[in-house]
Amino acid sequence: MLYVKEGEIMASIVNKNEVYTGQVIDFTHEGHGVVKFDRYPIFVPNAIKDEEIEFRVIKVKKQFAIGKLLTIKETSNERVEPPCEYYKVCGGCQLQHLSYEAQLQMKKEQVVNLFKRKSNFEDTVIHDTIGMENPWHYRNKSQIPVGKNKHGEIELGFYRQRSHDIVNIDHCMIQDKKHDTIMVKIKRLIEDLNLSIYNEHKHKGELRHIILRTGYYTGETMVIFVTNSKQLSHKNKIIEFISSEFDNVVSIKHNVNREKSNVIMGRTSYTLYGQDTITDQLAEYQFKISDTSFYQINPTQTEKLYSKALEYAQLNGEETIIDAYCGIGTIGSYMSQKAKHVYGVEIVEQAIENAKENAKINHIENATWEAGKAEEVILKWQKEGIKPEVVMVDPPRKGCDQTFIETLIELSPKRIVYISCNPATQVREIGRAHV
């Protein structure tokens, strides 16, 4: 049985490899179904809230277990047939078995629950999730690992669930359709040229990843070859094939990553063909995007997101804005139309160079961009007499630095608009700031 001491789970109530039946009562943040036996949670991928399921326990930990779905005894009305033929093996998507409307509701409920855990946030208003009319083929960036199977055959696709084994695919339901065609033809090229393929276990071989970036509205595509070597073998043949085969490819780049790491890209890139960047558009603004630039992967949703951020900023043209973690200046540029002045700060110097160039392209004259740590640059601006009415925050998944939070409190702007790709860190930091 389960032993509980002062609210702490001391031992598991389930055993590995045994089969159990249970009711799914919730979702994890990854979309897995949650079954509980006497408060002990078992996470079951592909199970849906309110379903009764039979599952086999495949992993047991002190605080939780992992189950494999065997049989659905009572099926949820929200269960749908996944449209992708690779869904059951590919690790790229987790929720195609759940109706899109239910996915939106699940995301809202997860945010609601995060805020409920903070007692002083109980009255926070959480609006409905804003979805898409057609939630397919929206991704403007594909990061495609390349490998070999045990028979020595080239595999090019995405990783299997919870592994680094590659699922060989020729199309993806969520990436730009142009990427499907490029992916298939590049695989044939790799086979024809007999390119050396990287083996992550031995840290030997050449080609690690193919990365594709496409401007959603312009159609311009960049192809990036990530290698474990300083040189790209058969470079001229690769350039000749891709440039003649695809009219939309305006940039071919070589990125060098020699690290024993799961990090996909290295620090050094070379332009082999065409432009250094591609161009895309958000609303009336154009942006140049390099191989390493952070750029939102869902352009139609990004326009909705930035429009909502602009609404929440409540600008009348007299405000000074600080855009922290500004990247290549997308949000700051969007805000500049209704602000007195925008100050953008970003730790990546190349991104700031892109932001300055993008400001010139869009004839934005009321913006200043500076490279450095947000908390340090903002303190410098403060000493220079810059007092923002609005601060925009869009940090990476790990959230904001604690020093930045303290700096933000000291600034005491009238409004903070916090865009987050990780609600858990957002709630944590709002609590730290006592907003």
Predicted regions and their residues:
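Extended interfacial segments that mediate partner engagement and assembly in macromolecular machines
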Residues: L70-P82, K88-I197, Y217, L232
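Rossmann-like S-adenosyl-L-methionine
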Residues: L2-V4, A11-Y20, H29, H234-R432
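Short, acidic/hydrophobic/Gly-rich beta-strand patch recurrent on exposed beta strands
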Residues: G33-D38, G157-R160, I224-V226, A355
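Terminal RNA-binding accessory module
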Residues: L2-P82, Y86, E376
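Hydrophobic beta-strand signal
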Residues: E54-R56, Q143, I322
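Short, conserved phosphate/pyrophosphate- and ester-handling motifs at nucleotide-, phospho-/glycolipid
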Residues: D50, Q175, N298
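Short, aliphatic-rich beta-strand segments
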Residues: L212, G219-N228, Q286-S290, V390
